[in-house]
């Protein structure tokens, strides 16, 4: 965005539920290929190094310091069994070891991979996919939460999860991702697969 512009036109028309969203790198070469390998080719050992990159994002240190909890975008049981690990949990655990909380937000419905869908269908795909762990719901009220994901393309996963957390009483929800597509690229990129 041009200097001095804080919000794009889309955000002005439909304000996102995130207080802020920080990204370490652009989701182009070589990051797209590296992230695909991290996520799909069983390279969980890369998580500490990728989290270190995320910590270097502008405002990341302040955002993590201010957070009460750092919450990874959860995978469905089916996707977790298929992949063997949740890449967002690995990143969150290394970003904020004392604040990472993988049991607060649940994926209660398996959905087709976001990367297989056009932008317009991504939000509908995730409707009802996330919920707060019922016994933990009181712990959300008044909390400043940070969602963690590896890639943000359309923002559907992060926005849907943020809305669930805000409806449960979170004071604010921000997000930190490793990579973000450029504005207007959401329909061409096929990378958000949580």
Regions found by a protein language model. Name each.
Residues 1-194:
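Glycine-rich phosphate/pyrophosphate-handling loop used in enzymes and phosphotransfer proteins
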